[in-house]
Amino acid sequence: ISGPTSQTITIGAGGTPTTGAGGNGTTTSFGALLTLPGGTGAPAPTASASAALSGSYGAGAGGPTGADVGSAGGNGTAGLILASSSALAGTASNSQFGQGGAGPGANAPLSSNGSAGGRGAGGGGGVAVGSVTAATGGAGGAGLIIVWEYS
């Protein structure tokens, strides 16, 4: 860009942790020149009396607009309900700036899951088993913009 005008930088928030479906991350932008969408939170998997296995995962963010080089975010691993008393929370996608949060297995007592280890990474999934109190998923990492100025 030659002779750019002043631009407003907006850093998107990471997805919010919940015991149900995860919250979506919000958009990071550099004025109208660059838009980076936030990732989507995973839907909560539902137990099924007829299925031995049930699961769901969050989709990675869509690709950036206005970037010379860019790519869409990756998907995390699926959270799985294995039986009425056993489940495994999904692990989040990594970014170039940090590791995604881990999703532990679930057998009582449950522990809360990992938050993102860096900007742009996802938070680990939440999990619940039977009548045990659900473990909350981890928070996603906030967005990031790096500006290099050359003269």
Residue ranges and their predicted role:
Residues T27, L33, A116-G118, L144:
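A residue-level signal for beta-strand positions that form part of recognition/binding surfaces
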Residues G22, G62, G66-V69, G73-L82, ...:
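Collagen triple-helix signature
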Residues A139-S151:
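Short, structured beta-strand segments at or near domain termini in extracellular proteins/domains
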Residues A44-P45, V127-V129:
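Short, solvent-exposed loop/turn elements at domain surfaces
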Residues S131-A135:
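Short, P/G- and charge-enriched loop/turn segments at secondary-structure junctions
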Residues Q96:
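Short Cys/His-rich Zn2+-coordinating modules
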Residues I1-G90:
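Secretome/extracellular-domain signature
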Residues G124-V127, S151:
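Extended hydrophobic/aromatic segments used for targeting, binding, or gating
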